[in-house]
């Protein structure tokens, strides 16, 4: 029986992970566990906790069959702790999500959803990161169905070592989704604004605000696919090396 770990960055009680859990529980032959942060931890990146202990707590989720465990840490903490200490054995697949909001383009470098999924490849386990392109929709059914379908395919076919699939689903009625595109990481740049405020006790503080900048992305990008109404599936690899630049750097004759 294949063991599947579900995790996220929105927290164990978030609707996305519970829609995914409910869908995965329907698949015969799978053992499902959900281990996720105890609260909202979006945009945590790949932070892990080394300065205090982590407390896993079994929680009750209405209708859940799978064990559901909250962790007092980051998304990466939750996945790492689950794989190395909590689960009864090594999982066959890690799925992070379903995230509230897209993780497209350069979002992946900030995303707690993607970071939690990356703990799979870091430890030699295939993984999916799944996001819905909406901050307000409560309908995760299409994303859950596609994630379940893709999970079975990955369990059957496997993925290359060090690889995860980053999946983004447009927030459209099921019948309006045009299909699936295999894509590359696009560009998604924000015009950041730091809103300065003053605490009643005299200390200044800042809120990060801003909006998406208009960036041209070609048709093969994840950004363009979702904007056009397609589900994007992007293979992402742990190895960030620019091999084409290694010889050029050697020609600099760097010394010390």
Curated annotation (Swiss-Prot):
Q: How is the cofactor bound?
A: Binds 1 divalent metal cation per subunit.
Question: Reaction(s) catalyzed by this protein?
Answer: a ribonucleoside 5'-phosphate + H2O = a ribonucleoside + phosphate
* UniProt GO MF annotations: 3'-nucleotidase activity; 5'-nucleotidase activity; exopolyphosphatase activity; metal ion binding; nucleotide binding
Q: Which cofactor does it need?
A: a divalent metal cation
Q: Where, subcellularly, is it found?
A: Cytoplasm
What GO CC terms are in its UniProt record?
cytoplasm
**Annotated keywords:** Cytoplasm, Hydrolase, Metal-binding, Nucleotide-binding
Instruction: Show the Gene3D superfamilies listed in the entry.
Output: Survival protein SurE-like phosphatase/nucleotidase
Q: Which family does it belong to?
A: Belongs to the SurE nucleotidase family.
Q: Which HAMAP family match?
A: SurE
Protein name (database record): 5'-nucleotidase SurE
